[in-house]
């Protein structure tokens, strides 16, 4: 299997560089970025509280199995799947003084660094893609329970991504982080965040854009978010 793929002029790549979409190029970038930020926000939440918004966790987890998504938003089921991420993009880019937003931003930067290393390892990409394919088969034919799938995805992360030179340090409540279930959730979210970071880069996103296009990114995320159902403070949908 070839991973998260698309086609352009008969060539194939690991990321969706050629998705057909009704969204503008900037909107597509922001949707992918929302996937990164959403994963980062939930990593922080699980690490600190042991809780997470199930609907958005499910959307992030399922994005790992979107090998042939026809559009950017379809990677997450639909754009509603990254509603929390869109709001979090605005939070991260407009309020750098909030402690939770700072932590979220640190995870985002870490995921982008991790993706940069992952992107240079086609051998690792093939292993991750193959093993995710096996987990996806299990989800389709046996159990699709998100927590059970997270345990399998966590093992993939430990066997592959955790061996890259850069390591993301997760900070939170030791009591929560020592629980196997929460550790699995965190690793699953980190891999989902890396997946979105890969997509973001394929769509033209670059870390320097936070500095030079931060206002535009936040405004675009806000506009997209306003078109969707509201999200409560704990991350759930109304």
Residue ranges of model-derived segments:
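Leu/Val/Ala/Ile-rich N-terminal alpha-helices, chiefly Sec-type signal peptides and the beginnings
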Residues: 14-84, 91
